[in-house]
Amino acid sequence: MFPPAMAGYDRAITIFSPEGKIYQVEYAGEAVKRGWPTVGVKCKAGVVLTAEKRKISALFDSSSLEKIYLIDEHVAASPSGLLADARILIDYARDVALSHRFIYDEPIDVEFLTKAVCNLKQQYTQFGGARPFGVALLIAGVDRHGARLYQTDPSGVYIGYFATAIGAESGTITEFLEKNYKFDMEMGECIELALKALASAVEITDSANVEVAYATIEEKKMRKMSQDEVASLLTKLGLLKKS
């Protein structure tokens, strides 16, 4: 039970606390910390996203749920937090990318797309009658500026990274990346590093619960690896554990 002095700040999205906080935005951040982890890594050759889909039931069909979503042929996004909120933002991002391609006959810049999504997120921190999106996104792709990787948060802030992680155990994954990351990697090394980073905090017992997508500087196209490719790579790296 919150004390009366705090109750108004705690419940209202349009009121700052005396400490300069908007509590509903901070609570949305807590939802992100409890989400399934996602890793993004950028290197000289391109950019990769890898994410975990946890088995929530023995009857769970992992193929029915995506964790990495293609936005356009050159860009993808992976969420952590409330997946229902993520679906709204993914659909919005796809609409923005499609409209840009239709109007200008060219693929949208990854940062421009990220900013559009974050503008929508930020609006939901200003107006009453709604709550912030309880989801963070990693948005990755290759455009005319090269490989791009951005992390967004529920407040609408976005920051570019060479390597980052969101979701549960993101602190452990980030520590691994800080120790092992180098920009001068080929695409294969970049993918392997992302998987190793994920495995540093998550026990992978089923390759069907891991998704990988990457884009190279040369091709400028985002490609999702098949389940067989992911299984082969996890086995090669010794990351697939027996359940």
From Swiss-Prot:
Query: Might you report a single GO cellular component term?
Result: cytoplasm
- Segment forming the signal sequence: none
Sorted UniProt keywords: Cytoplasm, Proteasome
Entry annotated with the keyword Cytoplasm: yes
Domain of life of the source: Archaea
Q: Name one GO biological process term.
A: proteasome-mediated ubiquitin-dependent protein catabolic process
Matches recorded under HAMAP family: Proteasome_A_A
Oligomeric form and interacting partners: The 20S proteasome core is composed of 14 alpha and 14 beta subunits that assemble into four stacked heptameric rings, resulting in a barrel-shaped structure. The two inner rings, each composed of seven catalytic beta subunits, are sandwiched by two outer rings, each composed of seven alpha subunits. The catalytic chamber with the active sites is on the inside of the barrel. Has a gated structure, the ends of the cylinder being occluded by the N-termini of the alpha-subunits. Is capped at one or both ends by the proteasome regulatory ATPase, PAN.
Q: What is this protein called?
A: Proteasome subunit alpha
Q: What is the lineage of its organism?
A: Archaea, Thermoproteota, Thermoprotei, Thermoproteales, Thermoproteaceae
